[in-house]
Structures are given as structure tokens and as C-alpha cells.
Amino acid sequence: MPIITKTFNYTGQLQLADLPAGANTLTLHIWGGAGGAGGPDSAGDGADGAAGHYVTVTDLDISSYAGSKSIAVAIGGGGKSGELAGNANGGANGQSVTQYSGGVGGNSGPVSVSGSGGGGGGATTVTLFESGQDF
């Protein structure tokens, strides 16, 4: 069977895709959402947020799924950057359409000296199911 590549990007929505008939293995390259940058402070810009975690799954055996197969992909969004303001809230968390959103960044101090923390990136999930099943 030929190798077929499908790329999913963050949309804020669950994305569904049917796998080709006869597919028996999957190889996945998965990135989580990146963290937001820290807010600037009185000495300069805040640091960049960390990249989303990367995972590779090679030759995942999906032959036990009897019928046609589909995947549901939820791409994690990036965290929002912090800001410089007295009592500023931390950056918003990166969203996921699953319950695995990133954490909210820490708040700034009471005066405009330290910036708030950037929000954490959302998780990316991939779920395999038999076509025709409710997901």
C-alpha cells in the first residue's frame, strides 16, 4: 500500500479523516501547542514560550479494527503571551477541543515592573475509531 500523508493544522475544531481501505498501520508525528511568551518587564522583553512537545509513533498496528477506519484529530492551540501592566492576568491557555487545554500563565506584580507569565499550550490528541461509530 502506498504511503499517504495527511497534515492537520490548528482550527479550534475537531477534524475527522477516513483512512484508506486496507490500511493496517499508522505512523504519527504529533506536536502539542507551544507556550506563550512571558510578558515584558521594566528591563526588556519577556522570554519566548517553549515549543510544543513532539512525539512520534511508528507503525502503530490498527489491523484489529475490522471495518473502515477513521481518525479524529484535535490540534492544541498555542498559549497567549503575558503582558506588562500592574496586576495583569497571565496569558490565556492554549485551547484544545478536548479537555486538555494548557494552563493559564501567572499574574504580574501590583506595579508595572514585572510581566505576567505566558499561557501553556493545549494538547494535541489523535483518536482512532471504526467508521460509522459515534465519536
List the model feature ranges, each with a label.
Residues M1-A37:
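GGW-centered surface loops in extracellular recognition modules
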Residues S131-F135:
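Short, intrinsically disordered, charge-balanced linker/junction segments flanking boundaries
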Residues T11-Q13, I30-F129:
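Glycine-rich strand-loop-strand elements at beta-sheet edges
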